[in-house]
Design a protein with these regions (language model features):
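Hydrophobic positions on the alpha1 helix immediately C-terminal to the Walker A/P-loop
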Residues: 49
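Residues at the C-termini of beta-strands that transition into short coil/loop
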Residues: 90, 142, 199
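Secondary-structure boundary/capping positions in well-ordered alpha/beta enzyme cores
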Residues: 60-61, 112, 164, 192-193, ...
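Conserved C-terminal guanine-recognition region of P-loop GTPase G domains, centered on the G4
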Residues: 128-135, 144-192
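Nucleotide-state-sensitive switch-loop elements of NTP-binding domains
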Residues: 3-26, 31-39, 44, 53-136, ...
């Protein structure tokens, strides 16, 4: 699928974002749609992780993906090719999405005959953590090359996330990355966050991640 719809989303300057986010979550609950907000730094492997996730779940769940970028539609095309319904969101220079922009994206995604929608937020460890998108759960990807001290440097990102995927574990032997320390740092920021080491490229750990996500979707739809 080469023709991916592109939507220019605009930031709301009116109602409280938190209020809009709560309203969006309620609407999603009524429609039995689970929205996951996926965040990370650029280059962490979000799109590759999404493709592996789609492959693991597409026979069980109807999946839609909203790809947020300042420009380009490369990621949305890759996701559509993987078998998910996809839309590209251009943020017009904004480094995050808020609830109104997310609502616009869901509307642009079309008929919402989906169980799971993944919002791939703009690659950034600061701004996206500050705005409630209306998602049911927040997830983030930390890649091994970024270092094990990111929870200390970007506390809010780890505080708002329900699950942390530690990606690119296949290169652990080549980087000074201490998995135990990283888990400890994450627990300092958010003791409730689930930590799942993965390699999106080889598929290691994807089954555990898919199991967690499947359970969350089913619980939301119950």
């Amino acid at each position: 699928m080469n023709n991916v719809k592109i939507l220019e989303v605009k930031q709301s300057i009116f109602a409280s974002n938190d209020e809009q986010a709560a309203q969006l979550r309620q609407s999603l609950k009524e429609k039995k749609i689970f929205l996951l907000n996926l965040m990370s730094a650029p280059g962490s492997g979000k799109t590759t992780t999404l493709r592996s996730t789609i492959a693991a779940l597409k026979d069980e769940l109807r999946i839609g993906v909203m790809e947020a970028d300042i420009d380009s539609d490369v990621d949305a095309k890759a996701i559509a090719a993987a078998g998910a319904k996809a839309i590209q969101l251009h943020t017009g220079g904004m480094c995050h999405l808020d609830a109104e922009m997310t609502r616009q994206g869901l509307e642009g995604l079309g008929p919402q005959d989906v169980d799971l929608v993944v919002l791939e937020n703009v690659g950034n460890l600061v701004c996206p953590a500050e705005f409630d998108t209306g998602a049911v759960k927040n997830a983030m990807i930390l890649s091994v090359p970024e270092g094990d001290d990111k929870p200390l440097k970007y506390p809010l990102m780890f505080q708002v996330c329900d699950v942390v995927l530690i990606n690119k574990i296949d290169v652990l032997p080549y980087f000074d990355f201490d998995m135990d320390k990283c888990r400890e740092y994450i627990a300092m920021r958010n003791p409730k966050a689930k930590v799942i080491p993965i390699c999106a490229k080889t598929g290691e750990g994807i089954a555990e991640w898919a199991d967690w996500l499947r359970e969350q979707v089913k619980a939301w739809q119950a």
